[in-house]
Amino acid sequence: MNIFNYTTLIFRRLSSTFKASNKASIEWKKQNIAVKRKIGGYWNPKKKLPLESMDEIRRLKKEKSSMSCSELAKLYGVSPESIRRILKSSNRPLDDREKSRKEKRWLNSLKSNRDFA
C-alpha cells in the first residue's frame, strides 16, 4: 500500500468519525435553539417546585435510573425540560441552617394567621 492510499484511508476514517460526532453536536444545538425559541429567551417555568421536591426527583433518578425525564415530569406535573434542568443542576441537600430558617418562616406564618383569626 503506498502512502497516498494509506493517507486517504486514514482521512476517510477520521472524517466519518468527525461527521458522526459533529452530527450529534448539531442535533444537540438544534434542540437547544428550539428550547430557547419556545421559552422566549430565558428560563422561567410556570410551575416552580420546592427544594424538597427537587431533592426527591434527584433521589428517584439515582434509585431508578431507568426512569426518563418524561416519566418524572408526568409524576410531578411539570415539563420534561424542568426535570432535565433540575437533574443537571448541582445537588444541594437542605442543610441545618436552611431547615431552621424554614421552620422559623413556618412558625411566623402560623403566628400571623392566628393574629388575623
Curated annotation (Swiss-Prot):
Q: Which segments carry the region annotation Disordered?
A: 89-117
Tell me where in or outside the cell this protein is found: Mitochondrion; Cytoplasm; Nucleus
Its predominant location is mitochondrion
Q: Which InterPro entries match?
A: NGRN/Rrg9 (IPR010487)
Q: Which GO terms describe its cellular component?
A: cytosol; mitochondrion; nucleus
Per UniProt, the keywords (alphabetical) are: Cytoplasm, Mitochondrion, Nucleus, Transit peptide
The GO biological-process annotations, alphabetized, read as: mitochondrial ribosome assembly
Say if the entry is tagged with keyword Magnesium.
Answer: no
- The answer to whether keyword tRNA processing applies is no
Highest taxon of source:
Eukaryota
First and last residues of the transit peptide: 1-46
What is the protein's known function?
Required for respiratory activity and maintenance and expression of the mitochondrial genome.
Please state which protein family the record places this protein in.
Answer: Belongs to the RRG9 family.
User: Which protein, by its recorded name, is this?
Assistant: Required for respiratory growth protein 9, mitochondrial
- Origin species, per record, is Schizosaccharomyces pombe (strain 972 / ATCC 24843) (Fission yeast)
| Source organism phylogeny | Eukaryota, Fungi, Dikarya, Ascomycota, Taphrinomycotina
